[in-house]
């Protein structure tokens, strides 16, 4: 028979499980918040996000609630991307995936073993609603590369904005195959929607993101990979018992780069990277800009290039530099400012040289040693000088 302490422990355990079930069934562990607040209290999930506004990074952070983002592919990168956007308080999130959660996915982030067998979009939506019930999450469990599903995908991003009937603000591609990337590329070119393409290499030690503005920058078909250019069926490249490697670290970094640039684009701060790569072996982050291909195979890309060329160009106004005037007319203490690279003025000359890094200077420089021969004048005396001549020299001294 169980003791009183054991019964109490069982009751506490059951009560804890009941609270979790209630929170899950309600869609979240807290009540919805109508308006974001910058009040610094432990119960405010937006205080640290609103601090970006107070620090002058973002002019109006709450605008993120008026943004709608579509995430295509809820795998290693896509699930973390959706998680980050949900925690940032995005207004609307539309998820696309047709796969199921497997135990083989547990080496990556976000999903848990008890979700194995569930569709990725439903499992993700359940967790994301628990994290932030303020975000409106829509799920689409189908393969966008089929003819029937492509039309549904096209309509979903065309009418999935915050206001009914308006397009989404941004499409994020987090898929793991070229066929799906080409489908997203075609849809966004047709609708003239800006989107981000992302990916991680098969050896899991490199990745990238690419911001595609139809007509302005290169689309995915402008410089396609060999598999796409040669119309090779990706399924024929797969081998039984062989799979691509994956690291949660690389996928987390790529997802972070993707969401960071998404926030910069949606909230208009910083500079959005056209292309940002990542090499984990040497911690290298290459950046570049890609121009559209005038002979691109995608006819919608050609149309968007024509539209972009027909737009009136923005006139650049050259800023006239203002003349710098001294803040104070008088310099009572004789203070002088020198440039950081002015090593001649910042370090005393003592006759000795020290190799130090740029921007550093020595706190103490030892005085140069002086030789007695330099301060006193001596007269050379040769051995063949006579005694009379030597006496004459001594008298003249």
Swiss-Prot record:
Gene Ontology terms describing biological process: protein ufmylation
Catalytic site positions: 243 (glycyl thioester intermediate)
Official protein name in the record: Ubiquitin-like modifier-activating enzyme 5
Residues reported in the UniProt entry to bind ATP: 76, 97, 120, 143, 177
Function: E1-like enzyme which activates UFM1.
Record InterPro entries: D-isomer_DH_CS1, ThiF/MoeB/HesA, ThiF_NAD_FAD-bd, Ubiquitin-activating_enz
Gene Ontology terms, MF aspect: ATP binding; metal ion binding; UFM1 activating enzyme activity
Chain positions recorded as Zn(2+) binding sites: 219, 222, 296, 301
Organism, as annotated: Aedes aegypti (Yellowfever mosquito)
Keyword Nucleotide-binding assigned: yes
Taxonomy, superkingdom: Eukaryota
Keyword Hydrolase applies: no
GO CC list: cytosol
Region described as Disordered: spans on this chain: 362-384
Family to which this protein belongs: Belongs to the ubiquitin-activating E1 family. UBA5 subfamily.
Biased composition (Low complexity): 375-384
Keywords attached to this entry: ATP-binding, Metal-binding, Nucleotide-binding, Ubl conjugation pathway, Zinc
């Amino acid at each position: 028979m169980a003791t009183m302490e054991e019964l109490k422990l069982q009751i506490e355990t059951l009560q804890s499980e009941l609270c979790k079930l209630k929170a899950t069934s309600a869609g979240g562990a807290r009540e919805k918040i109508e308006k974001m607040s910058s009040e610094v209290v432990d119960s405010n999930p937006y205080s640290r996000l609103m601090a970006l506004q107070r620090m002058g990074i973002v002019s109006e952070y709450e605008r993120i609630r008026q943004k709608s983002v579509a995430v295509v592919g809820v795998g290693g990168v896509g699930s973390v991307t959706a998680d980050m956007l949900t925690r940032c308080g995005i207004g609307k999130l539309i998820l696309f995936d047709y796969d199921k959660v497997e135990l083989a996915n547990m080496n990556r982030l976000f999903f848990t073993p008890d979700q194995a067998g569930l569709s990725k979009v439903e499992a993700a939506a359940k967790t994301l609603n628990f994290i932030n019930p303020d975000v409106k999450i829509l799920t689409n469990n189908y393969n966008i590369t089929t003819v029937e599903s492509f039309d549904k995908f096209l309509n979903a991003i065309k009418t999935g904005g915050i206001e009914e009937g308006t397009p989404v603000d941004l499409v994020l591609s987090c898929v793991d195959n070229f066929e799906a990337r080409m489908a997203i590329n075609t849809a966004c070119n047709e609708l003239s929607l800006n989107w981000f393409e992302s990916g991680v290499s098969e050896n899991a030690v490199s990745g990238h993101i690419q911001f595609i503005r139809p007509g302005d920058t290169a689309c995915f078909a402008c410089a396609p990979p060999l598999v796409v250019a040669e119309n090779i069926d990706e399924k024929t490249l797969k081998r039984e018992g062989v799979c691509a490697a994956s690291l949660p670290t690389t996928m987390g970094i790529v997802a972070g780069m993707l969401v960071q640039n998404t926030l910069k684009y949606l909230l208009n701060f910083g500079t959005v990277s056209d292309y940002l790569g990542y090499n984990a072996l040497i911690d290298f982050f290459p950046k570049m800009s890609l121009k559209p291909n005038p002979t691109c195979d995608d006819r919608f890309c050609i149309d968007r290039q024509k539209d972009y060329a027909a737009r009136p160009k923005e006139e650049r106004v050259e800023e006239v530099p203002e003349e710098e005037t001294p803040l104070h007319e008088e310099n009572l203490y004789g203070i002088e400012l020198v440039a950081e690279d002015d090593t001649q003025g910042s370090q005393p000359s003592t006759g000795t040289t020290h190799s130090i890094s740029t921007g550093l200077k020595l706190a103490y420089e030892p005085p140069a040693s002086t030789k007695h021969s330099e301060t006193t004048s001596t007269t050379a005396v040769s051995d063949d000088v006579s005694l009379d001549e030597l006496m004459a020299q001594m008298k003249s001294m």
